[in-house]
Amino acid sequence: QDCAMIDYKGGGGGWGYSFKLAYAQRCLVQRCYSREGRHPFVANGRAWGPNVFVDCYATESKNETGSHMKYATGLLYDNVKVKAEKFPGDYGLVVRNRGPFYEHGQMGGQNVFWNCVSLKYNSIPGRIVCETPAHAMNFAIGCKGLRENGTDCNYFNSYNGPDGIYD
């Protein structure tokens, strides 16, 4: 909690993941900040949950925040704000099926985005993708951003009190 990862410099691959949960269960990441992270707040590689990212903020994000690369369950993104890098990237808050793209496939089930915000540079609304697989549910509740087709949402682009589920 109360950590920052600022201006990471390095190559691709697994580098630049600001706050990553892998093989994780019952973890709380709270009030953390990322600047120029490749994947600011992610769970990948069999994060079985419950796991929570609460009151976290990312600026100049270089890629998606959400479950990433293999299946993650029981994730709560509570009042997380992500702002993309200055170049026109298609990033934001994401849980989806990435198909045969490398080893990614379906990235998660039983995940919730609660009162989260996705922005592109210049405060243009950013993308939120919250696909639901056949065997589980994912939710985006009270979030602000661009709702991508196939996204299961409740009260999208509106405040949904309380500020956070976790508080």
Predicted regions and their residues:
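Right-handed parallel beta-helix
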Residues: Q1-K9, Y23-H39, A47-K62, Y71-K86, ...
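Metal-dependent DNA phosphodiester-chemistry modules and their immediately adjacent helices/loops
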Residues: G66-H68
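Long, contiguous C-terminal flanking segments immediately downstream of a protein's structured core
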Residues: L119-D167
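Short, tandemly repeated low-complexity microdomains enriched for cysteine and small residues
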Residues: P88-V95, I124-G126
